[in-house]
């Protein structure tokens, strides 16, 4: 899967009349990586770092949709399942945001995120523990037990038993994950989860630190230019969680293009 990342230097070379939000922008195609930071060199030689503000679970879900379109149904189910796991991780960070950043959106000390990352890698990297942490924090936030999408049976058959799902099974699985994420996003938006939900870039910063620690890479000091690519899931847009387009409709529209 390739991402089209805009070159901001090229963008500012465009005439004023071509800088609208819907205008074509010069982009650099990059293979999907394991962090949200991409160092790019465009065709004009501009070098810059792009900070992709799409969340990892959104990108992984899009990867599943692309696999569906190309009729790779095992890969689609795997991507959807992993996207849901990363959504739980996103939610955990979201619930803990006030522990990481103050009301002025300033990080609470330089060691706050690295310490949490070490705790995460040592304790919460197993999916069962992540779900347990998510449920506990959700109950604390909303006072009710979260309704989870039961994806374990098909997921385990596909990943551990080499099962090849049908197109319908993969579509139904993807739609189930989509509806689950959408309902949680709507819930978060309605309450604004104690204020930090709108601060998507700060959730993303915490996620980047976790990714870097997982990969044993140096923590970034330069996040670069913020950019976003259009994807099926956009957890910070009410047009997504109040919309009605299905995974099947989206895949069909991609096939027409």
Descriptions of predicted regions:
Residues 51, 67-75, 142-146:
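Short, solvent-exposed segments of well-ordered alpha helices
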Residues 136-257:
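Charge-enriched, short contiguous segments at helix-coil
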